[in-house]
Amino acid sequence: MDRKLIVMAVCALAALSAAAPAAFGQEQKKAVPKLHIMHATKAVKAETGEAVKNEVAAMGASKKSGLPLFTYTIQSDRDGQQYTGVIVGADPTAKGGNKSTSVSTFIVPVIVVTQTVGTGLDANNMIVTAPGKTVFDPTKNDNSCLAAPNNNPLQLFQQSPIFQNYDISVGGVDMGHTQYIDAFQRAEFYNLLKNPDNYQVLLSPIKTLSPVVITVPAASGTTLPPEFGACGPFGIVDIDFFDAFLDNNVLPALQPQVNAGNFPIFMLYNTVLGFNPITDIFVNCCVLGYHGNTATNPIQAYSPSDFDTTGVFGPTQGDSNTLSHEVAEFVNDPFGNNPTPAWGGVGQVPPGSCQNNLEVGDPLSGTNFSPIGGRNGFTYHLQELAFFSWFYSSNSTGIHDWFSDNDTFTTDAGPVCVPAAAASGNTRPIVHP
């Protein structure tokens, strides 16, 4: 049986493509296409997901996953059908009991070493490469894309509102001194909570592990040097190679400390993922992050996320933007297959294409929550996220009866999405045996 990592394109970006020459030092002779941001999900098999739901519903826990989970069942007024899924945390509808949940989390810095560098673009806008080694090390100071005292990528990552407590408000209502995803979960189910202040879903405790080094074969990755228009080197790695390396090498090596009861986050720095051939950058790039699951029993959830400071993706789409997207989706759709009525033509799902899972980041990819000024003086960018009700119901469970945490969505997703007859190619599978 195959497992697939599904990726959908979101939005075109200008910085790199506008600056990229046909060859260094030459005048650009034709318009160059634009890069695209993509996010991804690697779901468990359908039968595994159903087994987890059934176990959690019957016993309050699953032998296939050590995560704290609750099940939900909802009759959607978008299509009249009933849907069941699992979410990380405590059931917001349950009476009494402990409504505070913590997920032990590991930050794993990934040092990526590529073996080639781009020297230009050919007539088909494919990257021309030559031998050359580049090291992307998030533990080292970067004085090209960052400035002291905030020039250490790993420290900035650790200090972000995904891991640290900040004063966060949603629609003028104080969500407390907490992490961004915890604030989102509280706002998402606000109308269901008798005492919202007691409802928490926290990443805690958080521990940073020793860096992992991944040396990328020449055929599976390359680097664009600053001459392509970024403030520093920009790495691209084949996502099939990368995910297989995590599955087969990194995750097994981190056991038993990293296990099915916790959540490892792999920090990439100015390095994105793409599909082969990765030199076809304007077609096969750029996956900034994904949340996935292993095919093992019990299931290991994990998420790689790029902390981008190159500016390639625009001034508001860097740093913690991808991290907020992926962690929120891990919490709300931990196994990648919580079913919803089909929706589409919004966020990273292009017109004529549809998606049908509870991926709370995807409908608003490219749209941000209010930036948060860090105590370190660094401004963190976080993505706006869709509430549970947006996917299922015209009656919002969210704060202010909203459908997203910055009020971009003022109604639910609307009529069930019907894909255009010619809509294909909007998903890109990573296939693992």
Task: Report the location of each language-model feature.
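Signals and flexible motifs at protein termini associated with secretion
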Residues: 39-51, 55-56, 60, 65-66, ...
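N-terminal module-boundary/linker segments of secreted carbohydrate-active enzymes
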Residues: 24-159, 392-433
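Bacterial N-terminal signal peptides that target proteins for export
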Residues: 1-9
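Active-site-proximal segment of zinc-dependent metalloprotease catalytic domains
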Residues: 234-330, 334-336
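Low-complexity, serine/threonine/proline-enriched polar segments
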Residues: 136-230
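Metalloprotease/metallohydrolase-associated module, dominated by Zn2+-dependent proteases
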Residues: 277-313, 317, 334-433
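Bacterial N-terminal signal peptides
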Residues: 9-18
